[in-house]
């Protein structure tokens, strides 16, 4: 007999079955549901992230660690994190940062020696300026001077922009274009891990644009985590909600 299931309180649960998942190499978009074997009955899952290992994401639309489906009702997850779980940085011009961890069951998190960081938001675009180049007696004729692009937000995969975000910091925005005495607004700085991107600089014609919203450190997804360590503003950056 490979698996034994017992019905408890109307829920089928694996009896004495614990699925242990060891992450020992850097990985992206880790799907807990798939890695646990796409279970059809409740299961207990233990995820061990080795020291220094990074779990990231290739897109802000998908968390670094998540589930393509929630685990069956009654399941539990334990995450022992000695590495880093980090969402992708948001792209320039107000791109939203990615989520680091999305819960798929009732979860216990030991983050004592690890980090869980949401992706930084992308920096805002600089505002546009303009210059009237017509003579005093002629109808107005404008030259428009564009603002600079914002920087990418921080992430294991940094957001793209004038400067790409790094793991620990957002990328700098570009300076605005210059025409004669007129300068477009500068692009805003990409957000640090779990931090919104900065406003772009205002132009004389259009205002500055806001920075992007940071990704969550943990998307609760209706579940409530139990933290056994490492739940502080340094090791968990971004909202837990």
Predicted regions mapped to residue ranges:
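N-terminal segments that cap or nucleate solenoid repeat domains
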Residues: 17-64, 225-232
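Exposed regions on extracellular, virion, or secretory-pathway luminal proteins
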Residues: 11, 38-40, 72-75, 210-211, ...
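Beta-solenoid repeat scaffold
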Residues: 69-82
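Glycine-rich, low-complexity segments
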Residues: 8-20
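Extracellular disulfide-bonded cysteine-rich modules/repeats
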Residues: 2-7
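Intrinsic disorder/low-complexity segments enriched in polar/small residues
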Residues: 9-10, 36, 138-139
